[in-house]
Amino acid sequence: MADKKRYEELINILDQYSYDYYVIDNPTVEDAEYDQKMQELLKIEEAHPEWVTPESPSKRVGGEVLEGFKKVAHDTPMLSLANAFNQEDLADFDRRIRDKVGDDIAYMCELKIDGLAVSLQYENGKYKQGATRGDGTIGEDITANLRTIRSIPMKLQKDYSIEVRGEAFMPKRSFQKLNEIREEEGQMLFANPRNAAAGSLRQLDTKIAASRNLDIFLYAVADFGEMGVETHSAGLDMLETLGLKVNKERRLCNSLEEVYAYIEEWTEKRAGLAYDIDGIVLKLNNLEQQRQMGNTVKSPRWSIAYKFPAEEVPTKLLDIELNVGRTGVITPTAVLEPVRVAGTTVSRASLHNEDLITEKDIRIGDTVLIKKAGDIIPEVIKSITEKRSGSEEPFHMPKNCPACDSELVRLEEEVALRCINPKCPAQIKEGLIHFVSRNAMNIDGLGEKVIIQLFSQHLIKDVADLFFLSKEKLLELERMGEKSVTNLLASIEASKQNSLEKLLFGLGIRHVGAKAAKSLAIHFDTMDNLKVADKETLTSINDIGEKMADSIVTYFANEEVHDLLEELKRAGVNMTYTGPKLEDMSEEELVFAGKTVVLTGKLEKLTRNDAKALIESLGGNVSGSVSKKTDVVVAGSDAGSKLAKAEELAIPIWSEEDLIEYLPDEGGLNE
């Protein structure tokens, strides 16, 4: 019969095996020996459940099913980093540092792991709690799921009570295996390892998290000063002595030239790593100098993240397809041999227009270089002409629309070819998708696949038909059950009460965006007033130029538009502006009157569009760039160059919470 001493001995042995294998990558035993000792441990725990502690290696395999994720407050905020995109940005950062603390400085440079920021709390050396970064102040409790990561020790080498920060991630090989399994099971594939890691750590079933083979690198303590060290580099060394996994590829740099060399080295070597990185993090090494530099609302002034330029990858151009947009513009799209770019698999990319294809001499069958603009949108950069075999085919735009066969035209001062047939089915379908979108009529449950079904089965021919759909007809569609149909019909009904600007934007009048639609709705109050307005009246309104005014007059001169509006009226769709009018609001309510506000980074409680609409409703103007005329910058998480410029110009910087304090208390935002 086993005694407790043997049980505790097994825990220590298995912990050491895990440290050797997962942390320092130096396995000291065969898998069979590890498994044999784990089975011995499990048998003892089955016989003596009262001995089991949260630090037991058996807890790493998962099994606990969680009810949800509690909120966790970070005692020390988990700040995000400002971004640098070139040497000029880094030189500006370096200048600000030197202006404040002098020239006796060094930077600790570390790989920027592309994963999920987390915090680990240890109490008397034992793992107590793990949490996500969240908004930097409040995160989610993912203690059980982080426990399944084998490289996170359940006990430190010393009995410290500390909060450690790091990046949880999914290695490339684990990501590939996971997607292979999901493909075999007919499940949706993860776009990239970062999304897979984040999704794994938010699983309520910890067994799923345990099966995902996640890893972690630790890079900071909430307050390194508490550990008796004077530099960040010494702090990282101490983390290693505690048994925590720290990335080995860090380097202490004594000049910007050394920083540039480190960046250049890892720009070239990043593809060979077993995990994704998306940049390099610079940290002022001296902790006292860090304290002198201080922090902004969202980021430390003593650290910055250099983001790698967009990755360029070669692949084969298999074909060029033509897509018809809602305004009739014909856009050529490259069909590519699937290739991995910046963390996702790319098989299609925009070619923009015929002139660009001709200018770049892009041919079907070419080997082409592609990248993601802003690491998001795939685009073809150029053909690699030296790889041509002679079988490649030059591309020529057709003379007729691929959807309705109408003759294509090129309007004055436009490079794009356009189908001007108002009954073109492709334009109508794209227009319907736009009409139901969030910024327009915001009809939930009416995605592209449902619209395509409705259109192909002749249940709708224009946007007005949406409001006359019956439950019986909707139930006949694929993947539309009783609950889905009920929710969809309720959403359609609710959309009838939208204020006029939502309808105006949804109608897709050429050149009229969401902001102009709001200005028109406020000025004219009703659709009837707007549709008889002349060009002179329209151009007298802020945000409405001559080109837009011409487009509006032309739109409402169309008899088919009059018929459409009558159908929408018959369906009960509101055609009046129901929002607040500036002239009816007091000075106290117009808290942003005459103010220019810039939004940057990710907001947690508000969408970017909601924040913009609320600021504008209170008299403010939302701009896309920071200048001396900017009054306030609202910075969410991962704010970049706009935040840095605001700091440079000494413009007031608000957090999202600061913004919410100035907004009317709608929807519990101020709770």
UniProtKB/Swiss-Prot annotation:
This is DNA ligase. DNA ligase that catalyzes the formation of phosphodiester linkages between 5'-phosphoryl and 3'-hydroxyl groups in double-stranded DNA using NAD as a coenzyme and as the energy source for the reaction. It is essential for DNA replication and repair of damaged DNA. Pfam families: BRCT, DNA_ligase_aden, DNA_ligase_OB, DNA_ligase_ZBD, HHH_2, HHH_5. The active site is at K112 (n6-amp-lysine intermediate). The gene is ligA. One of its GO terms (cellular component) is cytosol. It catalyses: NAD(+) + (deoxyribonucleotide)n-3'-hydroxyl + 5'-phospho-(deoxyribonucleotide)m = (deoxyribonucleotide)n+m + AMP + beta-nicotinamide D-nucleotide. Belongs to the NAD-dependent DNA ligase family. LigA subfamily. NAD(+) binds at D31, A32, E33, Y34, D35, S80, L81, E110, R133, E167, K283, K307. Its EC number is 6.5.1.2. It comes from Listeria monocytogenes serotype 4b (strain CLIP80459). Its cofactor is Mg(2+); Mn(2+). Residues 587-671 form the BRCT domain. Zn(2+) binds at C401, C404, C419, C424. Keywords: DNA damage, DNA repair, DNA replication, Ligase, Magnesium, Manganese, Metal-binding, NAD, Zinc. HAMAP family: DNA_ligase_A. GO terms for molecular function: DNA binding; DNA ligase (NAD+) activity; metal ion binding. GO terms for biological process: DNA repair; DNA replication. Coiled coil: none annotated.
